[in-house]
């Protein structure tokens, strides 16, 4: 039986970002005690492919002399500060779209940079640019793998990091040296998280909106039909609350064919369970990551099929858009590539990738007027006017980040 209300719900989502193999998943394990790369292909290849999630409490503890230290383990003379959710984003260049969709959930970020490699590596640069584009300002730089380098190299690495972030959103971010593998200096990192990444304030009286980042079928093969559980959606509420028994609507829903036409039907279902981490709740609020058990056929939700959708109360969800008008803002240079490439202007009829909250879709530029572009989408999205959208372009067989847009209108 899952215990109720043993721990408060997480109050903040913190992204774990950086270049592949710089130790993000190991650092997540050191912070939370949880491995996030449990997908079979991830274990085989040793990299994160999907977004990983883990929650951890942070305790403020006092020793007999009154000195303070921070930890996830509750001991004597310890006060619970809060619970945080870690979003472990893949660092591999082919998985940039997954990292971008995860950034929609982040209230702050840990940018992991390995001391034993020159800084910046391609995805270090790309992920920092993504944080800038998505407006994530609360950043801590984690200088990892200090156990693998000399003192001189650690200092040289620190200087490389300072030069790299100069003039960026992370120019004044603290740099915390750690060894994630040996859990060295993790207490200092917890202290920095408490100081530099505050829990955002949300309006819990608004209609609930949840960005869906994962969806699952939790039934084991061979489960009797009478014991099957409904599909599960996972993500983060950005406003409002969900309670047990709520009727919810999921948009864009399910794609069906009517004659020669493709039709998208919104899905409605009932909330039958609410979980954050390993605890169940009667209601969930914004702040951390949560999983909602529903009465949906689990076949519909298996394998992240509902990723990129939005859930809300019935009739209170955003419209489904098949086209959008954006005010575009392009970077000077393509990021993530080993070569220095300038970003060329967007062209009419060009195909681009758009990350709208947790949804990744492809669209064709139909019309342009100055920096304003009109795009028809291959797959529709649920969105709001004023949302920030990441724009990617195919460069040398990879989707590369080239800028962002602000949604002006949706159709």
From Swiss-Prot:
Region (G1): 18-25
Chain positions recorded as Mg(2+) 1 binding sites: 25, 48
Region (G3): 88-91
Region (G2): 46-50
Enzymatic class: hydrolase
Catalytic reaction equation(s): GTP + H2O = GDP + phosphate + H(+)
Membership in a protein family: Belongs to the TRAFAC class translation factor GTPase superfamily. Classic translation factor GTPase family. EIF2G subfamily.
HAMAP family hit by this protein: eIF_2_gamma
Record's protein name: Translation initiation factor 2 subunit gamma
Organism: Thermoplasma acidophilum (strain ATCC 25905 / DSM 1728 / JCM 9062 / NBRC 15155 / AMRC-C165)
Lineage of origin: Archaea, Methanobacteriati, Thermoplasmatota, Thermoplasmata, Thermoplasmatales
């Amino acid at each position: 039986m899952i215990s109720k209300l043993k721990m408060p719900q997480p109050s903040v989502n913190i992204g774990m970002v950086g270049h592949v193999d710089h130790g993000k998943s190991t650092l997540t394990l050191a912070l939370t005690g949880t491995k996030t790369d449990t997908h079979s292909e991830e274990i085989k290849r040793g990299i994160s492919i999907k977004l990983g999630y883990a929650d951890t409490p942070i305790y403020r503890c006092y020793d007999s002399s009154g000195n303070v230290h921070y930890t996830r383990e509750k001991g004597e003379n310890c006060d619970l500060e809060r619970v945080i959710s870690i979003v472990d984003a893949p660092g591999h260049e082919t998985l940039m779209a997954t990292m971008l969709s995860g950034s929609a959930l982040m209230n702050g970020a840990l940018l992991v940079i390995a001391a034993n490699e020159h800084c910046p590596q391609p995805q270090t640069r790309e992920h920092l640019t993504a944080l800038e584009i998505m407006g994530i300002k609360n950043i801590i730089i984690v200088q990892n793998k200090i156990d693998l380098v000399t003192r001189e190299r650690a200092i040289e690495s620190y200087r490389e990091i300072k030069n790299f972030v100069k003039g960026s959103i992370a120019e004044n971010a603290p740099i915390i040296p750690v060894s994630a593998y040996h859990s060295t200096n993790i207490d200092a990192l917890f202290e920095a998280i408490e100081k530099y990444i505050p829990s955002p304030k949300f309006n819990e009286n608004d209609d609930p909106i949840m960005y869906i980042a994962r969806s699952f079928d939790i039934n084991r093969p061979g489960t009797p039909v009478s014991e099957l559980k409904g599909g599960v959606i996972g993500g983060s509420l950005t406003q409002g609350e969900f309670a047990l028994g709520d009727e919810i609507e999921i948009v864009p829903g399910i794609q069906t064919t009517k004659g020669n036409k493709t039709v998208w039907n919104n899905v409605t279902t009932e909330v039958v369970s609410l979980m954050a981490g390993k605890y169940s709740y009667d209601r969930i609020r914004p702040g951390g990551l949560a999983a909602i058990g529903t009465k949906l056929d689990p076949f519909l939700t298996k394998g992240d099929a509902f990723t990129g959708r939005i859930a809300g109360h019935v009739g209170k969800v955003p419209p489904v858009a098949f086209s959008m008008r954006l005010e575009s803002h392009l970077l000077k240079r393509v990021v993530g590539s080993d070569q220095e490439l300038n970003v060329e202007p967007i062209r009419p009829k060009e195909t681009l990738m758009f990350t709208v909250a947790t949804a990744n879709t492809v669209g064709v530029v139909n019309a342009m007027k100055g920096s304003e572009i009109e795009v028809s989408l291959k797959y529709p999205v649920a969105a709001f006017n004023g949302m920030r959208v990441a724009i990617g372009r195919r460069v040398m067989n990879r989707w590369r980040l080239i800028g962002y847009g602000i949604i002006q209108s949706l159709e």
